[in-house]
Design a protein with these regions (language model features):
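Conserved beta-strand -> loop -> alpha-helix junction used to position metal-binding or nucleic-acid-contacting
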Residues: 1-4
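Active-site core segments that coordinate phosphate-bearing ligands/cofactors
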Residues: 6-72, 83-94, 98-99, 120-205
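Nucleotide/phosphate-binding loop and acidic/charged catalytic motifs
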Residues: 73-79
Length: 205
């Protein structure tokens, strides 16, 4: 995955990816995981062609399990965090999938944070799932950073700073990511995100 990232960085496509996804492509970019699986796990290509393989983030897996495999979906906030989404068009970035040779069909549908994600019956009765949101974006929302210019910093293993930048998508300089904070009633709110990987984890008791 590292070599592919370096190869992309040497081309004009690198800047296009940043301007489209809001994120710098790297080994953490989800579509590159699947590319590695395709190249290294025997039989996976055939299983994808048969429709026996699906891909997604942790929220996708949870919804899939909770609904008994009936719903394969993710939210805008989670999709934008993968680095595989055209965040302005609000859809998967087809050109990136084509470039690395990964079928977009294995990725989940993208829905609003307050959308219908099916129902679960694991507790006996039928319980509707009507909310899915990524972790840092949920913290931004929970801490009432609803208006453009409001900021939160979450400190734990690392530290994550998020700034609500309103309804207009724009990339940020200096390696700071631009992500979708949430999509409510068909309207996206964007945020910029800076990460310090080591904060609390610097202390080993």
């Amino acid at each position: 995955m590292g070599k592919m990232c370096e190869d992309i960085k040497a081309t004009p496509f690198f800047e296009e990816i940043l301007n489209t996804t809001g994120k710098v492509i790297g080994p953490h970019t989800n579509v590159l995981f699947l590319k590695w699986y395709l190249d290294n796990i025997p039989g996976i290509k055939e299983k994808i062609e048969k429709g026996d393989v699906l891909f997604g983030t942790i929220d996708t897996w949870l919804v899939w399990k909770l609904t008994g495999g009936k719903v394969h979906a993710t939210s805008f906030s989670n999709a934008s965090s993968t680095g595989c989404m055209d965040v302005e068009k609000q859809e998967w970035y087809q050109k990136l999938f084509d470039y690395v040779g990964v079928p977009v069909s294995v990725f989940p549908s993208i829905q609003s944070e307050s959308s219908d994600y099916g129902e679960t019956t694991i507790f006996g009765g039928s319980i509707p799932i009507r909310g899915v949101i990524a972790d840092q974006q949920s913290a931004l929302f929970a801490e009432a950073c609803i208006d453009a210019g409001t900021v939160k910093c979450t400190n734990g293993t690392g530290s994550v700073l998020n700034i609500n930048v309103g309804s207009k998508f724009q990339t940020s300089p200096g390696g700071v990511d631009t992500i979708i904070a949430w999509n409510l009633d068909g309207k996206c709110t964007y945020a910029v995100e800076g990460l310090v990987p080591v904060t609390g984890s610097a202390l080993q008791w």
